[in-house]
Amino acid sequence: MSVEDTQPLITHLIELRKRLLNCIISVIVIFLCLVYFANDIYHLVSAPLIKQLPQGSTMIATDVASPFFTPIKLTFMVSLILSAPVILYQVWAFIAPALYKHERRLVVPLLVSSSLLFYIGMAFAYFVVFPLAFGFLANTAPEGVQVSTDIASYLSFVMALFMAFGVSFEVPVAIVLLCWMGITSPEDLRKKRPYVLVGAFVVGMLLTPPDVFSQTLLAIPMYCLFEIGVFFSRFYVGKGRNREEENDAEAESEKTEE
């Protein structure tokens, strides 16, 4: 391989390193700003469960280091989540030079809507799902059983739900993207509604903790988001593939002229 051939690769690697460093710095800066409030952040996240606990019940720590490390771990996760727009922007800045003009126009709204829907999904989990799920689980405890949740177990439980709802709320973006690329169409998706409904419950079973209540609370919004995605996808059907064909045709004609 000649020096000229390695130059573009080295340039890309330097650019990738720069973008990765920017992502890491953004996470560290946000973490350092929030770490002082680590216990307050954990209290905020645990509030939906604490409100549903019977009188006199509290959360417990079964590991010696849990009271220190669990809030710190949560704060780091929050830092990652809050850094998502910066991370997505760095990804966009890295791949943008390789995209066509019409693709670049789509990416910005795609990144904004993806971030927004992810945060909306997490907010839905916190304000709607958590109170209902924890109320249901606390009230179904057998008689004589005192509900005292371990703080580390609770963190794992809620982060799984946060991620499940955040990712599931990306369904409209995924559908619009698939239709834009010409892989599917709104008509095909409408025909598959029964399968999508069953699939939503299967995904709910896989992504949420093993209780029917959480699975249902994820599956129903997922199906509603599917319908929203189908509605908006009709404005983007096949546009990406058509543009690619036009670009290929233009490139072919330029080669012929040469």
Curated annotation (Swiss-Prot):
Which keywords annotate this record?
A: Cell inner membrane, Cell membrane, Membrane, Protein transport, Translocation, Transmembrane, Transmembrane helix, Transport
Q: Which residues lie on this side of the membrane: Cytoplasmic?
A: 2-23, 97-115, 178-192, 233-258
Q: Which residue intervals are topologically Periplasmic?
A: 45-75, 137-156, 211
The record lists the membrane-crossing segments as: 24-44, 76-96, 116-136, 157-177, 193-210, 212-232
Q: Which PROSITE patterns match?
A: TATC
Q: Whose protein is this, by species?
A: Escherichia coli O6:H1 (strain CFT073 / ATCC 700928 / UPEC)
Q: Which family does it belong to?
A: Belongs to the TatC family.
Q: Which GO CC terms are listed, alphabetically?
A: TAT protein transport complex
Give the protein's biological function. Answer: Part of the twin-arginine translocation (Tat) system that transports large folded proteins containing a characteristic twin-arginine motif in their signal peptide across membranes. Together with TatB, TatC is part of a receptor directly interacting with Tat signal peptides.
What superkingdom does the record give?
Bacteria
Q: Name one GO biological process term.
A: protein transport by the Tat complex
Q: Does the keyword Cytoplasm apply?
A: no
Where is the protein situated, by its record's location annotation?
Cell inner membrane
Please state what the protein is called. Answer: Sec-independent protein translocase protein TatC
Q: How is the subunit organization of this protein annotated in UniProt?
A: The Tat system comprises two distinct complexes: a TatABC complex, containing multiple copies of TatA, TatB and TatC subunits, and a separate TatA complex, containing only TatA subunits. Substrates initially bind to the TatABC complex, which probably triggers association of the separate TatA complex to form the active translocon.
Q: Any idea which GO molecular function terms this record carries? A: proton motive force dependent protein transmembrane transporter activity
The membrane topology term of the UniProt record is:
Multi-pass membrane protein
Name the Pfam families for this protein.
TatC
Q: Which gene encodes it?
A: tatC
